[in-house]
Regions:
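Amphipathic alpha-helical scaffolding segments comprising HEAT/armadillo-like alpha-solenoid repeats
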Residues: 2-14, 33-45, 65-77, 96-108, ...
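Short inter-helical turns and helix N-cap capping residues of alpha-solenoid HEAT/ARM repeat scaffolds
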Residues: 16-17, 48-49, 79-80, 110-111, ...
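Solenoidal tandem-repeat scaffolds enriched in leucines and small polar residues
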Residues: 19, 36, 51-55, 82
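Core register positions within helices of long alpha-helical scaffolds
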Residues: 27-30, 58-62, 90-93, 121-124, ...
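Alpha-helical, heptad-rich or low-complexity scaffold/stalk segments
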Residues: 244-252, 283-286, 305-323, 330-333, ...
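Carbohydrate-interacting regions of secretory-pathway proteins
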Residues: 329, 354-459
């Protein structure tokens, strides 16, 4: 019967062969389910080998819920060092915040295996109310090997706060009087928030070299893209120490940002003037390939003639223009056709022949419509002119008067408008600029860069 079987299995827990003991632990759990937990815990308390501990831990994980994990508490006081370590690991596996107070004292245990298990477990057990305890421990711990685990625990506790705007509050208060800023500041990358970002930027600007390094690493690992503006400023400053990693951090944060493709394109354009190497340009082109917009395609197309960027540009253009797995339609138009025709010639890599064939096939099936025209070429004011009156007044003017006034308006354009760094610049005074052609179906993507006393708009 079952009782005789269980008796045999229980006896097997004491077998000399560790493999038999491991099988016995698994068998007891399989046969008795949660009812096996007390016997397995008793075995855990007396087992001296790591193999036995791993076997009983596995068996307990297969049958334990919150009620069963609570039975482990006596092991923390009565069990051997190796049993306490296993109990702590099981509590961490359960992720019950109620065990934080049980485990916390063992983070200072003189027994290294127990101490290491406890420190690592805190990240799974900590809640918002436990932050000050973790800050005290993180600030005072002597063994630097534990710093990263305690930082993870503090981040876990803070981010458990349901209100994202206050997740950094406890840490920020502690930083006002802490002598361990270098340990607390990196956690702010996970907790985020404007006040936290402002503090890190201030410490970066005013701190000593070591603090500047810590703050910079915090900025590049910031959890959302709100630090991208700071990283851009570091890139623009041409700081030789931080500039390269700031560039890469900016690209990473924009790539993962929860913003539209159009907004990402504007940010990539913003950093593009500082992509002075082919590697940087190709990194931006790789990211452009993720943006299914016409402006992204047109921008990628401008890099097709440079041998150092043509391959990355071609790959990006192909991915942008051709239909995706989610859509049966791709992009079309004269500019698209021109870019894809050149793309087919620039593709490289092991799948280049296949990709080339795919592009050629798509070109053959593309609608013959003219498609979108670019209103601004990024180089000069071709297609733009000075504005004469408003449309209603202009429609009532004699042709000869309109032509004369248009010539006068055009003469004023160079004094008021110019192109620099791929942008149309207005000096803040003078007349309006308008397109030469009239457009009835258009998409306008505008990146406002208005400086102090700026005066410009669209109507």
């Amino acid at each position: 019967g079952d009782e005789s079987v269980l008796t045999i299995i229980s006896i097997a827990l004491q077998d000399e062969d560790y493999r038999v003991r491991a099988e016995a632990a698994a068998a007891i759990a399989a046969v008795r389910g949660p009812a096996a937990v007390p016997e397995l815990i008793e075995f855990m308390k007396n087992a001296t080998g790591q193999t036995d501990q791993e076997a009983v831990k596995s068996a307990l994980m297969s049958v334990s819920g919150n009620k069963e994990i609570a039975l482990l508490k006596p092991v923390l006081t009565d069990g051997s060092s190796i049993a306490r370590k296993t109990a702590i690991e099981l509590m961490a596996w359960n992720k019950g915040n109620e065990y934080f107070r049980e485990v916390l004292p063992f983070a200072s245990s003189p027994e290294e295996p127990v101490r290491a298990a406890a420190v690592k477990a805190l990240a799974s057990l900590a809640g918002p109310a436990d932050q000050n305890d973790l800050i005290n421990l993180l600030s005072s711990v002597q063994d630097k090997a534990y710093i990263a685990d305690l930082q993870s625990a503090l981040a876990s506790a803070a981010t458990a706060n349901d209100d994202p705007s206050s997740r950094s509050d406890v840490i920020l208060r502690a930083l006002k009087s802490s002598t361990a800023k270098e340990r607390l500041i990196p956690v702010l990358a996970k907790t985020g928030g404007k006040d936290a970002l402002d503090l890190v930027l201030n410490e970066f600007e005013l701190g000593n070299p070591d603090m500047r390094d810590i703050c910079f690493k915090t900025l590049t690992s910031w959890g959302d893209y709100t630090a991208s503006t700071a990283l851009y400023e570091i890139v623009a400053s041409r700081n030789k120490t931080f500039e390269d990693q700031a560039f890469r951090g900016f690209i990473r944060q924009v790539r993962t940002a929860p913003i539209t493709d159009e907004q990402k394109l504007l940010l990539y354009r913003k950093i593009l003037p500082f992509a002075l190497s082919a590697d940087r340009k190709n990194e931006i082109l790789t990211q452009l390939g993720r943006l299914k917009t016409y402006p992204a395609l047109f921008l990628a197309g401008t890099f097709l003639d440079d041998p150092e960027t043509s391959s990355a540009a071609a790959s990006a253009a192909m991915v942008i223009a051709l239909p995706s797995a989610e859509s049966n339609t791709g992009m079309y138009g004269n500019i698209v056709r021109e870019i894809l025709t050149k793309t087919a010639q620039k593709l490289t890599g092991p799948e280049s022949e296949y990709n080339k064939e795919m592009v050629v096939k798509y070109l053959a099936s593309m609608p013959s419509d003219e498609g979108f025209k670019s209103m601004f070429n990024g180089k000069d004011l071709t297609g733009w002119q000075g504005l004469v009156e408003n449309p209603i007044v202009r429609s009532k003017m004699r042709r000869v008067d309109l032509e004369r006034r248009q010539e006068e308006a055009n003469l004023m354009v160079p004094a008021n408008w110019s192109v620099k760094d791929g942008c149309i610049w207005f000096n803040g005074k003078g007349s309006n600029l308008c397109s030469v052609q009239e457009y009835g179906d258009f998409e306008m993507l505008v990146d406002w860069k208005i400086t102090k006393k700026g005066d410009s708009g669209i109507y």
